[in-house]
């Protein structure tokens, strides 16, 4: 693992520090303020007639980003999370310690510098070192910069390197944290209660997806990593909670691309005595709040597309297929004509697809990518909405919507099905689809049906993909850019263990 000659040289320097009686991995030394606080607190020094203040003494810490040796002195750029600060170290103050520093210090090492503020001849506020300590010796040299396709792969595999070398990456994840905390605050202000539900399920439910399977040794049963928290959250509505939300991970054992990761973050929320129309209005308020909190304009650029949040629209599923997808009503209203049309367009259609799934194929290919401004698509086919309430006027459609922005689904919501007998029949239909080979069809969940039988009030529920939301609001082109440690194809190391190296 550490056979590289440059690594060996650094290991030798770490051992040399030990021989001098110094621990290359010290603990207990503390800074007095951050680099950013130092730069703010001592900005006045640059305006002094003699630009230094020897009466003040501070300790700063960070990683060495640049090292410039000049005989009996050196300049060091030290970076902590807040800022980069220059340190000046000279032999006059440190004597033998300076010789040790020149011998052992390298870019990448983590250090503590104690000294007073002063400004250089070029006017750069710096710390004049009176003490210098190596807190952590870096034995693997840092890359100067990332470039090229292979290095993009390395950035995702070794995110710690990405964070060290590319300062902008930290900004993305700080903004992600702000987005998540803002979403949480919004729902708390709206009167929702945050809850936690199981991550391991006896039956995978709440979405049409292929689950990950694990085994519970103590119970001697298989368990499924959750694909959605929906059915547990609705059990809470049955139990008497009227507005709940959960922000957590879901796991789906499916493909990966620029907008899909098998482990992803979602918020799901359920609101008793409300409808899916209420959720549409709530979603509009949420985006208004996020744009304001993040100081973003109503028009943002994402992947060279202008998204205007002032141009939000609502359109039915069939109207979208006709007016946006360009498919005539004559074709849309007949299953055999729709199938023939899809085949004529060169779309590979799996055998035995239901009419609703044929409509979904058409929507995915001809409509979704054209929905740039926020668009709420409503009145979904009931066949692809097994948990949604059936529309009172038309039993073939569901009281459901999906929100699309910049050509991608961002949210899915509906008025919840609370008729236990109807839900039982829907589950039976899903089981029949699974027996025909549909691996993503839902399982029968009798316990959930039994819960519904105890009475669930009229309820609306919605899910929003946090990762895609962050992509949209940060301009990230890949979901891997907004997940700290995204799923990657395995690479084996010398010990045949999966590695990021």
From Swiss-Prot:
Swiss-Prot/TrEMBL cofactor(s): Mg(2+)
EC identifiers of the protein: 6.1.1.6
Matching InterPro entries: Aa-tRNA-synt_II, aa-tRNA-synth_II, aa-tRNA-synth_II/BPL/LPL, Lys-tRNA-ligase_II, Lys-tRNA-ligase_II_N, Lys-tRNA-synth_II_C, NA-bd_OB-fold, NA-bd_OB_tRNA
Pfam family, one: tRNA-synt_2
PROSITE patterns registered for this protein in UniProt: AA_TRNA_LIGASE_II
CDD domains: LysRS_core (cd00775), LysRS_N (cd04322)
Co-factor note (free text): Binds 3 Mg(2+) ions per subunit.
Catalyzed chemical reaction(s): tRNA(Lys) + L-lysine + ATP = L-lysyl-tRNA(Lys) + AMP + diphosphate
Cell location: Cytoplasm
Binding-site residues, Mg(2+) 2: 409
Single GO biological process annotation from the record: lysyl-tRNA aminoacylation
HAMAP family: Lys_tRNA_synth_class2
PANTHER family to which the protein is assigned, alphabetical: LYSINE--TRNA LIGASE, CHLOROPLASTIC_MITOCHONDRIAL, LYSYL-TRNA SYNTHETASE
Assembly and oligomerization: Homodimer.
Name used for this protein in its record: Lysine--tRNA ligase
UniProt organism field: Helicobacter pylori (strain HPAG1)
